């Protein structure tokens, strides 16, 4: 019995060795990707991003490159080349995927060079003053509430938009600024998630722009486990949501093509709105109002963090409300706002007359 098992094992090993000789790097990546999709249990959005990164790895490497011909020197050169095209974060992820693919080759093809990527290092680029300024502009990109109101009112009075679109986009702007939700979380919001009586919202998903059985737009789980949360809302937000729900009921009654899927921020067909459309309206309104910032839906999320910081809400409470697991981003915005408040206090003290 023992000898039979040994013979079977030897036969399988020989088969793996034979297949390994003709296995290309691209074929390995494709096989690993298919295996990973079936076994990882990752959400749709994560897997779509993964597919894109694998596609980019293949785009920048030879289709006929055999796995057996690859060595550490080649991979280091390849990583260096990728870093000239993609961000440091993207290259780090790409290298991670390649390491997983190599592990797959070891497991299923008896590939002998398991540690081929272990000594490959990610290139480090020195940041220019321009890079630092761009990072700071992105990190500290928030609005004053007066500016949010200006943008909201501009959209509400924009005659180039249909009445329903004005109500929904302006509502999305205001709700985001006063809740700190990610745009995907806002668009995934359903009537059942909103408790108008107790003024709470259950944030339990995000929208992925794919076609599904019910229509266009699939509600997936939140970005992280910590992103799933329940938050309090004020009367203003409750009224905005109530008004939008009423608009949706009108659509359901009078528009035959409207399918009620339970979402709040919807198109004329009942599907979740596109975040890109809201971003376009936001950017256009900000430009028309001479707000010299790159205003996006994420700006509104930072705006909420800054608003809470100005109200002296604790860092921990802010992180819980906006669903931040990593405190890095929250701290940067929080610190920037509190430093600004300190400067304003100093200026007021200077003006005191003794």
From Swiss-Prot:
Active site: 182, 298, 301, 324, 334 (o-(3'-phospho-dna)-tyrosine intermediate)
Pfam entry (one): Phage_integrase
PANTHER family listed in its UniProt record: PHAGE INTEGRASE-RELATED, PROPHAGE INTEGRASE INTD-RELATED
Matches recorded under SUPFAM superfamilies: DNA breaking-rejoining enzymes
Designated gene of the protein: int
Core-binding (CB) domain ranges (all copies): 23-106
S-S bridge residues: none
Key words, A-Z: DNA integration, DNA recombination, DNA-binding, Hydrolase, Transferase, Viral genome integration, Virus entry into host cell
Family as reported in the entry's similarity comment: Belongs to the 'phage' integrase family.
GO BP annotations listed: DNA integration; DNA recombination; establishment of integrated proviral latency; symbiont entry into host cell; viral genome integration into host DNA
EC number(s) stated in the UniProt entry for this protein: 2.7.7.-, 3.1.-.-
Keyword field contains DNA-binding: yes
Domain of life of the organism encoding this protein: Viruses
Domain Tyr recombinase: 138-347
Cited function: Integrase is necessary for integration of the phage into the host genome by site-specific recombination. In conjunction with excisionase, integrase is also necessary for excision of the prophage from the host genome. It may bind the DNA.
GO terms assigned for molecular function: DNA binding; hydrolase activity; transferase activity
UniProt keyword Hydrolase present: yes
Protein's UniProt name: Integrase
């Amino acid at each position: 019995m023992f000898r039979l098992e040994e013979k079977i094992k030897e036969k399988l090993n020989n088969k793996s060795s034979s297949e390994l000789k003709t296995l290309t790097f691209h074929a390995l990546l494709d096989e690993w990707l298919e295996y990973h999709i079936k076994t990882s249990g990752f959400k749709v959005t994560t897997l779509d991003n993964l597919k894109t990164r694998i596609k980019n790895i293949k785009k920048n490497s030879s289709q006929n490159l055999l796995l057996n011909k690859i060595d550490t020197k080649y991979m280091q050169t390849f990583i260096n080349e990728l870093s000239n095209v993609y961000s440091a974060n993207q290259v780090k992820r790409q290298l991670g995927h390649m390491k997983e693919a190599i592990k797959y080759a070891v497991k299923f093809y008896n590939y002998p060079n398991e540690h081929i990527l272990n000594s490959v290092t990610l290139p480090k680029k020195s940041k220019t003053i321009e890079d630092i300024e761009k990072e700071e502009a992105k990190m500290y990109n928030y609005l004053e509430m007066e500016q949010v109101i200006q943008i909201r009112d501009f959209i509400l009075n924009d005659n180039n938009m249909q009445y329903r679109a004005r109500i929904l986009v302006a509502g999305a702007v205001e709700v985001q600024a006063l809740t700190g939700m990610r745009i995907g979380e806002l668009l995934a919001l359903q009537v059942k998630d909103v408790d108008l009586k107790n003024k709470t919202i259950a944030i339990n998903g995000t929208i992925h722009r794919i076609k599904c059985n019910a229509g266009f737009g699939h509600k997936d789980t939140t970005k992280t486990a910590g992103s799933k949360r329940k938050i309090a809302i004020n009367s203003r937000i409750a009224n905005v949501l109530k008004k939008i729900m009423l608009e949706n009921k009108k659509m359901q009654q009078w528009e035959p093509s409207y399918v009620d899927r339970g979402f709040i921020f919807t198109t004329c067909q009942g599907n979740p709105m596109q975040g890109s459309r809201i971003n376009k309206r936001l950017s256009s309104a900000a430009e028309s109002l001479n707000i010299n910032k790159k205003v996006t839906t994420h700006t509104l999320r930072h705006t909420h963090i800054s608003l809470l910081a100005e109200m002296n809400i604790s860092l921990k409470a802010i992180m819980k409300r906006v669903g931040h697991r990593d405190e890095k981003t929250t701290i940067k915005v929080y610190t920037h706002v509190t430093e600004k408040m300190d400067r304003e206090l100093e200026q007021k003290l200077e003006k005191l007359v003794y």
